[in-house]
């Protein structure tokens, strides 16, 4: 069936899956393609942006930046009394990284930035890195309630 699709990677591990999967999806369908990824997973596959550049594959990457391995931190919060081991890290300057790849970069710090992003910017036909900073201790609630 037509329409929009969202293909999450769940069960095995999500780290590093979104960008290569979005590139593959773009080969199958020329519709606007978005990859949604956390900063931990992004650091495992950011070089795949160069694949998109080399093959001129339009792609929008939404990067949630909380400077931590979010699911690991959530687990250590809930099950280990906030004793954090090896989940936090230092991120690169994502604007400089995007510039080094020759791709677009936008930072969305609040709702106004998000509205402006979609109202003013043409996000089609190019490769864009869209960084959204998040609080490292704000965890999503999943349907499984875990």
Task: Name the predicted role of every residue range.
Residues 1-146:
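Thiamine diphosphate
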